[in-house]
């Protein structure tokens, strides 16, 4: 039996009942939207706590029936038969509640900025960067999310040297945050006459989209430069200084946007800068919080090789959790749920172990 914090569970039940009452009595109040949001957040955990409470009561009744000598023999036999099944259900519910009570990542409900950059491997790396972007596009479509292109630098033979997009929808960052790192591909390029397998890589960064309230950027901390946007081969695509480069002086972080609209470039560059600064703060806080024992998956180290896509063998391997799937074709079509769910589960297990080590 898992030792769950009963006081915390009772507080959540009490708070949920209070919200239900306030929403029913004041449907037109100014606080209704806020209450409805909190109600929605608590629904899952409160539902599981109530299920667990009912199951425990059922187990107690069955145990009492089994141990009561005055109970009809047939009823006692029935209790003996049913009790183990109820106890199994309790064990599952306790695990569910424990996970739902874990500290929430404040960024989990945010949208994300997805950045993919070709790494080692030349032309093959740019093609792979394009393959990864299409994989995430299809995954997003399956989830009902919206993907909007921010900027793209195309490769000479297709794919991308770099591509940045925003991904918007429910729970985007919670699902994509473990995709950050180096993705490696092993396959035979179409131009390889000898059939040799080449290895190349692309780097993925997933940043939670930050709002003004999340991160403060002071005007005196940024320098904004404008320049002419260049097209393929370096030719100027227009005669106005539409490209924008924003430098965050304290950190040295630089963001460049070079589309046709200077106003749009400035807004996009600030959006990406804000996300990178917010991500930097999150990484620093995570490092300080669990320096002694960092979650293997949660580190988000951009230089860490996290996954290998082996085309000749039709397999994909996530090195952080030693998971290998022989369905590479489906993964490249956006079927990422098995990988994503395994990573989330591993992270939750690490958090539970971390909490268990606390005095």
UniProtKB/Swiss-Prot annotation:
The keyword Cytoplasm applies. InterPro entries: PCRF (IPR005139), Pep_chain_release_fac_I (IPR000352), Pep_chain_release_fac_I_sf (IPR045853), Prokaryotic/Mito_RF (IPR050057), RF-1 (IPR004373). Disulfide bonds: none annotated. Methylated by PrmC. Methylation increases the termination efficiency of RF1. The keyword Cytoplasm applies. PROSITE patterns: RF_PROK_I. GO terms for molecular function: translation release factor activity, codon specific. It is found in: Cytoplasm. GO terms for cellular component: cytoplasm. Pfam families: PCRF, RF-1. SMART domains: PCRF. The modification N5-methylglutamine is found at residue 235. Its main location: cytoplasm. Gene3D superfamilies: 3.30.160.20, 3.30.70.1660, 6.10.140.1950. Keywords: Cytoplasm, Methylation, Protein biosynthesis. Residues 283-309 are annotated as: Disordered. Peptide chain release factor 1 directs the termination of translation in response to the peptide chain termination codons UAG and UAA. Belongs to the prokaryotic/mitochondrial release factor family. This is Peptide chain release factor 1. It comes from Brucella abortus (strain 2308). The gene is prfA.
């Amino acid at each position: 039996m898992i030792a769950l914090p009963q006081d915390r569970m009772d507080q959540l039940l009490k708070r949920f009942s209070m919200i239900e009452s306030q929403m029913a009595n004041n449907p037109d109040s100014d606080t209704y939207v806020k209450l409805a949001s909190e109600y929605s957040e608590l629904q899952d955990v409160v539902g599981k706590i109530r299920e667990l409470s009912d199951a425990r009561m059922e187990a107690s009744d069955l145990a009492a029936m089994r141990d009561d000598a005055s109970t009809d023999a047939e009823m006692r036999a029935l209790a003996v038969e049913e009790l183990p099944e109820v106890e199994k259900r309790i064990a599952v519910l306790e695990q569910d509640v424990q996970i739902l009570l874990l500290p929430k990542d404040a960024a989990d409900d945010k949208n994300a900025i997805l950045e993919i950059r070709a790494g080692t491997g030349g032309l093959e790396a740019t093609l792979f960067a394009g393959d990864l972007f299409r994989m995430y596009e299809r995954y997003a479509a399956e989830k009902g999310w919206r993907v909007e292109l921010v900027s793209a630098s195309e490769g000479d033979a297709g794919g991308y040297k770099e591509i940045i997009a925003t991904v918007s929808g429910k729970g985007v960052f919670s699902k994509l945050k473990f995709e950050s790192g180096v993705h490696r591909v092993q396959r035979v390029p179409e131009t390889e006459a000898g059939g040799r397998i080449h290895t190349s890589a692309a780097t993925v960064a997933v940043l939670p989209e930050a709002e003004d309230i999340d991160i403060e950027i002071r005007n005196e901390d940024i320098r904004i430069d404008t320049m002419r946007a260049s097209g393929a081969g370096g030719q100027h695509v227009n005669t106005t200084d539409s490209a924008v480069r924003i430098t965050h002086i304290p950190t040295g972080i630089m963001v460049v946007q070079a589309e046709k609209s200077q106003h749009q470039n400035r807004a996009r560059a600030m959006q990406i800068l804000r996300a990178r600064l917010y991500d930097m703060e999150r990484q620093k806080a995570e490092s300080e919080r669990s320096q002694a024992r960092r979650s293997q998956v949660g580190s988000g180290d951009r230089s860490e090789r996290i996954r290998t896509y082996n085309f000749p063998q039709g397999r994909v391997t996530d090195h952080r959790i030693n998971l290998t799937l022989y369905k590479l074709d489906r993964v490249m079509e956006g079927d990422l749920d098995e990988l994503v769910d395994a990573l989330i589960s591993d992270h939750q297990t690490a958090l539970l172990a971390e909490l268990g080590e606390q005095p």
